[in-house]
Structure formats: structure tokens, C-alpha cells
Amino acid sequence: MKILVLNCGSSSIKYQLLDMETESVLAIGKVERVGMEDAIFEYKGAGEKIKEIGTILDHTAGVRKVLKALTDPVHGVIQAPEEIAAVGHRVVHGGEAFVKSVIITDEVKRTLRELFDLAPLHNPANLTGILAAEAALPHAPGVAVFDTAFHATMPRKAFLYALPYAMYKGHKVRRYGFHGTSHKYVSQRAADLLGRPLEEVNLITCHLGNGSSVTAVQGGKSVDTSMGFTPLAGLIMGTRAGDLDPGVIPYIMAREEIGISEVNSMLNKHSGILGISGISSDMRQIEEEMEKGDPRAVETFEMMEYRLRKYIGAYAAVLGRVDGIVFTGGIGENSPLFRKAVCQNLGFLGVTFDEEANNCRGQERIISGPDSKVAVMVIPTNEELMIARETAELIRNR
């Protein structure tokens, strides 16, 4: 069974074609600047990587270009589009309507439109991708896999905010959490690495990248997570503030004489690593400037480590027993320095640290010492494979 995985943004398409018999990637690529005359198309299948620049009018044209590349006599990996059994779509927000992956129907699409207000930057683009795939691949059923679904198992005491209850009842204002597909994938891999059934394992999974979140996973189920109603809450991120006193917002608006859109832009695009450091939103550059002794880079790094450590401590209290801590995402997988800084301060959990094992980037391994009471792991995430698995399972069992 071959599954095409699509992750559509407002002007982009990221895609992979996977063979689920071997769970191998047959082709991978992306389309950027959709709707522009200088759209960028990238494809890597059989042979060398292809990059083209030209007009791609819309997402449907983009998907059709992907299919043309996949079936190309020289660079293609399939002979006909009909070999694609189904299309798995990343959808950012499922709200309370979707607590697991679903086969896409007209009713599902109607409900997705009703959820636009919960994720105005992402869900409309995700639906555009769904419609584009239906137009280009009418034979292939679609499956929606939601970033929020893994966190649907959180108890009410964890997801409700202490606001007037009418805000929840009337507007569904609550903690939803994100990065669920990544947290689900690495928690399953962590149980495999530990050689234990997932149902018996308590984990703290740390997805650290430009967007970052941490999740308490009890027996394979999310019981708490750092992101909230939006992906703005929790850890310090590339350009997002993470947790902050809500009272700061009206104060800044009054002092700076700015409106909702300006403060929203500040919190989402100009805060976090970039805002504190004044250098970059990229952790690699922060670490480079740290080595040169830049005080703001040092302070940014220390704040990030401190915030994550606070969450790990809190989630250890939530879980009662921690069997494993997982680092994933761009920073989690590729920054030995940050992992070391965090782990050196986790002695209260019985964590010991293997510096030699930690000296790796993008490799799956255990980096805690042999006498550590908690296994600390680096597990490269694979959201596309997780989406493909969920898609294949639904298609097989429908």
C-alpha cells in the first residue's frame, strides 16, 4: 500500500510518498510560493534531486505537479497515480470534534470549516490541501490526522482554564495542545527502545524546535501538555513567547499604543529566542554567539533550559513516576549542548548522563548513564510516517 502524505500551508505543500509494506520513503519534496509566478518545486525520488522555478497557480496545480513527478518515466517511483491507495493530511486543529484520525467525508469538511476560528492560519490551508488532493486524485480516499488529537485524552482538570465557565461552554476556550503526532510517534518509539509495553511506561516527551512543546505521557496517553488554546503557550520558542502573565498584554497595548493585531504579531513573530537575544530565532546561532561570550545569547540559552526544566519537574509530579525523557525536534535532536544543560540539572529525578552517548546529532539513542533511574533518549521524530500509519490503518479497516 502506497500512501501520499500532504502537509499544506497557505502557500506551500510538503509531501512524501511512502510504501507501507516496508514503511520506506519513495519520494519526498515540497512546493513553495504557491500562487506565485516564481513558485519553487522540489522533488527527490529515483535519481537526483529536482528543483524547478515557475508558475504554480494554486494547490491543485501543485498536487498535480507532484503527481507528474511521481509518475515521470525517468525520476518517478510509480507508474500511475492509481497506485496511491490514500492521501494522509496533516490538519493542525481538530477541536473537540475530532479526537482521532478520520476518513474525510463531506461532513468532515463541513466541520473543519466550522473550526477555522480555532486555527485561522492553518486549518483553511489544510482544507485547501484536502480539496486539491480530491481534485487531483479522485480515486484515493483522504484521511485527516490532527495535531490536537493525541491530547484528547487529557483530563478536564488539565485542559480547563480557570475562566468563567461560559468561555468554555460557549466558545470552547480550553487547552488543546499541539505537536500531537510527533509526541505520539516518539512515545511509541521510546517504549520500543525501553523494551516495554507502551501501556506500562510513563514518559516526558520534549519536542524542541522553532515551535516547542512538552507532554506528560502516561501509558501511551497524553495527560498534560505545555501548549494551550493556541501554540503560543508553554516553552520559549523561536519567535513565540511561551508562558506569560496575561496582564502583560493590556499593559503593553496601552503603553505602546498598539492594537490586537500588533500585539499578536509581537507575541508570535518577534518574541521567544529572537526577542530575548536580539540575534536570531535559530538555536544554532545562539550557541555560536554563546561561544563568543555574548551575554544575551547566554541568557537566552539559560532561560530556555530553565523553562523546560520547570515543565519536566511539573510533569514528573503529574506522572508520579518517570521511566523516560525524550528529546526530539530540530533542537532536541541536534543540540548536544542544550540536552546536556537540561540533563545536568535533573539529578533530583535520578538522572545520570552519558556525555559520549550525547555527542550525536539526529541519531536515535539512549544518552543517560547505565545507572540512571530515568532513561533519557534522543528520538528523531517522523510525523509523516505516523500520518501514513494512521491513514493505512483506517483504510484497511474501513
Curated annotation (Swiss-Prot):
Its EC number is 2.7.2.1. Mg(2+). Can also accept Mn(2+). InterPro entries: Ac/propionate_kinase, Aliphatic_acid_kin_short-chain, Aliphatic_acid_kinase_CS, ATPase_NBD. Substrate binds at R90. Pfam families: Acetate_kinase. It catalyses: acetate + ATP = acetyl phosphate + ADP. It comes from the Bacteria. CDD domains: ASKHA_NBD_AcK_PK. It is found in: Cytoplasm. Keywords: ATP-binding, Cytoplasm, Kinase, Magnesium, Metal-binding, Nucleotide-binding, Transferase. One of its GO terms (biological process) is acetate metabolic process. Its cofactor is Mg(2+); Mn(2+). GO terms for cellular component: cytoplasm. Pathway: Metabolic intermediate biosynthesis; acetyl-CoA biosynthesis; acetyl-CoA from acetate: step 1/2. HAMAP family: Acetate_kinase. Homodimer. This is Acetate kinase. The gene is ackA.
